[in-house]
Amino acid sequence: MKAFPVICLGFAIFSSSICVNINILQQIGYIKQQVRQLSYYSQSSSSYVVVKLLPNIQPTDNSCEFKSVTQYNKTLSNLLLPIAENINNITSPSPGSRRHKRFAGIAIGIAALGVATAAQVTAAVSLVQAQTNARAIAAMKNSIQATNRAVFEVKEGTQQLAIAVQAIQDHINTIMNTQLNNMSCQILDNQLATSLGLYLTELTTVFRPQLINPALSPISIQALRSLLGSMTPAVVQATLSTSISAAEILSAGLMEGQIVSVLLDEMQMIVKINVPTIVTQSNALVIDFYSISSFINNQESIIQLPDRILEIGNEQWRYPAKNCKLTRHHIFCQYNEAERLSLETKLSVAGNISACVFSSIAGSYMRRFVALDGTIVANCRSLTCLCKSPSYPIYQPDHHAVTTIDLTSCQTLSLDGLDFSIVSLSNITYAENLTISLSQTINTQPIDISTELSKVNASLQNAVKYIKESNHQLQSVSVSSKIGAIIVAALVLSILSIIISLLFCFWAYIATKEIRRINFKTNHINTISSSVDDLIRY
């Protein structure tokens, strides 16, 4: 039993390093689905493949005349003639016709394009530009035609690699040429007719879009693989220098082919292949996760974490990969789409359950189980888990968010009537009793609309009640404010009156005192005057 609890490519130098803890996350319903290597690609160069459509057959002592080859040659000519004519119309417009246009000095037959978009016109320009290389490769048609090898590499004048492929030559070399002198001509002709007929069927399927317009309908590498047959890996490895397998590159659709020339006399076809440049970031993993519901705090919840995470060393980012091409083991992107994660999210990914956030689920929810490497991870508190072999119900304790069911506990499992065969052992070596606080559960995406509407209505009624109380308080405050203003005004007026009265009294006191002083002086003068008069009389 292999334990794989943590994914961390870098070495944890510091104690605070954070890695994706697969084991803990699985116990709360966050299950790892796929781990892919991150690679970057760009279209940088082109290569050419010369497909030799008619095999070489060694002469025999019986001087057999193979009618199947003659018929195959005729049928193939009818198939390729429209393609050759179409390419000729695009690359060589009639000198007397004005229906052509120049792009960067290149003449293109507009009539051959028909109604074309900008991308299709660009493809036509590429088709015309490829003619120089195609003619250089076609100049070696004699050496290509004479070879009896299934794959034949040549170098043309611009030092671009050209691979001559004879798609059915491998079958002819290994099976038929060894039996030419030991079997009758009729039997050999029948065998050859069968092989050529099957191959012709493939050609018809592959080149059906190109019968309309090769400039507007590029050959996908998947169709080209059918055309090249068993030689596809050799061709891919010769044109693309990388350690990634040919199957990964082809399935990602990173290579496309376009017919640039057809040589009917030699039954040769030159296909231009756009070869990408691929760079792999060795320490970068893109991990896909699948979330199922879990039983937390006596209710069904689901963890709030991204579906895809990029891990480089001990750092994690959210990675949407919206413009990337995914295969089984690789993810090919033209640029890095990483988005920062919050510290709480990083801690949650590292297995710190106290930092995780869950959203409650109301109503029916279908994502309650997932198949994982031959085992089943299910929320057996929200659906019925019944083991049929041996027969017993599976109970999930309150302290378990989900239940992992492997071969040791059950061989045939029924989940709400769906039967599954368990074929593997779980790689989890331990399980924890989870403790999650109520504050970690939020309501982000309610499903039971009627319940939520009832809550909204209740909230509105409470709001109306509070508004009425508020209005009453405002009215009370308004009346009180008026009374208070009157009292304040009266107090101010009273104070002013008192001040004025005091000032008046003070002024009256001063005036009275001054009058008394004047009267005293007058009386004193009168007394002196009387004394003087008496003295004079005496």
UniProtKB/Swiss-Prot annotation:
Q: Give the glycosylated residues.
A: N56, N73, N89, N182, N352, N427, N433, N457
Spell out the subcellular localization from the entry: Virion membrane; Host cell membrane
Which sequence ranges are listed under topological domain Cytoplasmic? 508-538
Provide the Gene Ontology terms for cellular component: host cell plasma membrane; membrane; viral envelope; virion membrane
Please provide the record's keywords in A-Z order: Cleavage on pair of basic residues, Coiled coil, Disulfide bond, Fusion of virus membrane with host cell membrane, Fusion of virus membrane with host membrane, Glycoprotein, Host cell membrane, Host membrane, Membrane, Signal, Transmembrane, Transmembrane helix, Viral envelope protein, Viral penetration into host cytoplasm, Virion, Virus entry into host cell
Residues marked Determinant for fusogenicity and cleavage efficiency (site) = P95
Q: List the disulfide bonds.
A: C324-C333, C380-C385, C387-C410
Q: How is it modified after translation?
A: The inactive precursor F0 is glycosylated and proteolytically cleaved into F1 and F2 to be functionally active. The cleavage is mediated by cellular proteases including host FURIN during the transport and maturation of the polypeptide.
| Gene3D superfamilies according to UniProt | 1.10.287.2480, 6.10.10.110, Head and neck region of the ectodomain of NDV fusion glycoprotein, Newcastle disease virus like domain, YojJ-like
Site positions per UniProt: Cleavage: R102, F103
According to the UniProt entry, the coiled-coil residues are 128-156, 452-477
**Region span, Fusion peptide:** 103-127
Secretion signal, residue range per the UniProt entry = 1-19
InterPro entries (UniProt xref)? Fusion_F0_Paramyxovir
Record note on quaternary structure: Homotrimer; disulfide-linked F1-F2. Interacts with host LAMP1; LAMP2 and LAMP3; these interactions promote the cleavage of the viral fusion protein F.
The text of the family note is: Belongs to the paramyxoviruses fusion glycoprotein family.
In the UniProt entry, what is the domain comment?
The 2 coiled coil regions form a stable six-helix bundle.
What's its job? Class I viral fusion protein. Under the current model, the protein has at least 3 conformational states: pre-fusion native state, pre-hairpin intermediate state, and post-fusion hairpin state. During viral and plasma cell membrane fusion, the heptad repeat (HR) regions assume a trimer-of-hairpins structure, positioning the fusion peptide in close proximity to the C-terminal region of the ectodomain. The formation of this structure appears to drive apposition and subsequent fusion of viral and plasma cell membranes.
Q: What is the name of the protein in this document?
A: Fusion glycoprotein F0
Q: What is the lineage of its organism?
A: Viruses, Riboviria, Orthornavirae, Negarnaviricota, Haploviricotina
Q: Which gene encodes it?
A: F
